[in-house]
């Protein structure tokens, strides 16, 4: 089984896309570009401050405007650790996901 086979499919599709973007700490540029492109593709409003922080907002689904607002917060970078002797290059390689 692969990550894209998991349910709900749409969640794992987006998660997999994120794993393909190298994003070590202090080198979030590729992730910022990915998120800006994602926002444009899905018509999500996005703002970037001088520090590179992103704020994305999406209006409520029609008919759901009276529902509570959902807020999600996340880091764009990843603390990179690997075992001695492994050849993974966190600056360039995607993360290989394993479904166990």
Feature-to-residue mapping (PLM):
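N-terminal hydrophobic or amphipathic helices/low-complexity stretches enriched
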Residues: 1-21
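Bulky hydrophobic/aromatic packing residues
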Residues: 12-15, 31, 73
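Phenylalanine-focused residue identity feature
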Residues: 14-15, 34, 38, 90
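Residue-identity detector for glutamine
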Residues: 17-20, 50, 73
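A non-catalytic alpha/beta surface segment that caps or lines the substrate-entry region
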Residues: 24-70
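Active-site metal-coordination/substrate-binding segment of hydrolases
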Residues: 65-100
């Amino acid at each position: 089984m692969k990550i894209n086979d998991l349910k709900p499919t749409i969640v794992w599709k987006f998660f997999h896309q994120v794993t393909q973007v190298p994003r070590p700490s202090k080198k979030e540029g590729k992730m910022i570009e990915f998120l800006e492109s994602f926002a444009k593709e899905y018509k999500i409003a996005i703002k970037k401050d001088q520090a590179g922080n992103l704020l994305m907002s999406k209006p409520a689904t029609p008919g759901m405007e009276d529902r509570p607002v959902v807020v999600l917060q996340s880091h764009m970078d990843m603390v990179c650790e690997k075992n001695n002797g492994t050849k993974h290059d966190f600056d360039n390689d995607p993360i290989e996901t394993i479904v166990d």
